[in-house]
Amino acid sequence: MSILATEKEKEFMIVNMGPHHPSMHGVLRLIVTLDGEDVIDCEPILGYLHRGMEKIAENRTIIQYLPYVTRWDYLATMFTEAITVNGPEQLGNIRVPKRASYIRVIMLELSRIASHLLWLGPFMADIGAQTPFFYIFRERELVYDLFEAATGMRMMHNYFRIGGVAADLPYGWIDKCLDFCDYFLTGVAEYQKLITRNPIFLERVEGVGIIGGEEAINWGLSGPMLRASGIEWDLRKVDHYECYDEFDWEVQWQKEGDSLARYLVRIGEMTESVKIIQQALEGIPGGPYENLEIRCFDRESDPERNDFENRFISKKPSPTFELTKQELYARVEAPKGELGIFLIGDQSGFPWRWKIRPPGFINLQILPQLVKRMKLADIMTILGSIDIIMGEVDR
């Protein structure tokens, strides 16, 4: 009787995991309730990186706000820039030149590769494999060299503009990028050889954190989290934005819904991104890299613009882009899922409402359900397979 009584009276252990260091998964805190090694409950605590990004947007013009958006998901900044200019472009029915659209696709896919690489390294380190963590920086550095040559910045690029991009591709950049694509395919093959069939890796990820297709839809998951559960859904195919329809590529998806499936989806996406980049580089058309019509100046209404002091275009600020009085939801397929903004204009230069739909925030909601009845060591495997960046989770 005394043994049974002590079993009923035993208390669970509550452990704080985090707040983690910003260089890994971001400043996330998990309050984990344990029964020995078994996880009974897990409560994520968010908000350590909240900076009021939505409110800041409502007090800035689009051009002023562009440098801020690169701080949401700071590992895939091209996507946050893309969604920031896509919304106003759709509101104003602004046509983007074909060359600018091709440049955007190239930059977006390079950014997807860089994001997936910096997911792969820490994910493998979390589950005990240190070697790939050093390998991924080798390829990622080459991507950042390409970004720096084209945009002037390695990470916070501030490259997209309403109606196009800030600058054309420099001389020799296309050949350099094609060389990178050829080299990177051998790098992906090396990762697959090193990781995919490794028995220790499979022991840690196979059958861990399983999500069914219907369950993934009900939770609102997107990106690799959704595609790894057997749902073939990619906004590049669904929404036909930019010029993705002009390229031959396949949506990567798996049926199993576990951490291994999410790994395989992301590895496959890196290969498909290279295919898209190669086709875009080989077929990139000539012409302007931005829609110059929306930057025309009204000479008659402001004659002071044209006097001697202001005759150089560099001294003339871009006209304030006016957001028409309507509402719009725009979205792109970011590396972590569906990144969207709900935008309401009110006939002024500032948005009346700027609602951000971050994929990481919504994908993170399923974490407590996935880790229940799992072992303590599986928490980092499942959290790593979700792929979150707290900059966009907390905004």
Curated annotation (Swiss-Prot):
It comes from Citrus sinensis (Sweet orange). Its main location: plastid. The keyword Plastid applies. Its EC number is 7.1.1.-. The keyword Translocase applies. GO terms for biological process: photosynthesis, light reaction. Pfam families: Complex1_49kDa. It is an enzyme of class 7 (translocase). It comes from the Eukaryota. This is NAD(P)H-quinone oxidoreductase subunit H, chloroplastic. InterPro entries: NADH_Q_OxRdtase_suD (IPR001135), NADH_UbQ_OxRdtase_49kDa_CS (IPR014029), NDH1_su_D/H (IPR022885), NiFe-Hase_large (IPR029014).
